[in-house]
């Protein structure tokens, strides 16, 4: 709620979650005066280490309260999703099953595969009413993580956000997702992954900042997790990003897909340009030939049925019935036990 500087700032950094209060909380290793002396850079305490800075830029803070009361209320909400310790499971709230169909989900994904939509609308329809509690809401917004309840059961949600950068995975999104997955696994909180990912963000900036090792953090976190892990693919599931986002190939317990799902190495146009490159180049009308091959590839792979026939998808579900399927899936997997090999600890690619 107040300032924290110097060596003392590593104390909150070691905790599971940090909640700051806007206007009064500051965190930095070296304060504005030292920064001015060493680098001649003038910066205020708020700009250097205030709540807004650590919520959006650094991602150090997980929540920010408008005032002290709001901060305390956020803490209470957070604790309500957690067990007392790592040897217990979170308490289930009373819930009576009713009509769990959600008709609005049937029209939530646009027909145009390149048109964005807000994944939080999907989350709010799948989870219990007003139960989603987002973590790091202003940092790496192309991935959404947070706690929710499903028929009273506490779960962790990791979802790609098509409304931001088309939902791609980048360095910050990978780190954000990996940390949340590991926390949920540490405290026996089941995981729901909602996937619409076109791939990893390309470019020199990402490569030079270690997208390989950072993307591997998310992969490692999912592979290491022993809690129930269930995935719903709403639209795109392309390439390595598909594998990383809790696919069957890395041990997911159940994978569902909507009819709009596209599970492939890449999008139809990009794949057609590579696979049929010679044929397109030698054609009298390359543009027309590309279009034909794009449609051919899309008909074969821009659907979930080919993947389902290979066992990568357990069931293709109607969007409106997804919540009902998830309630049953988490109930079935609630007694999941995994015997891990004896070791001191794993070596996540930090």
Q: Predicted segments — roles?
A:
Residues 1-350:
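Ligand-binding clefts of soluble mixed alpha/beta catalytic domains
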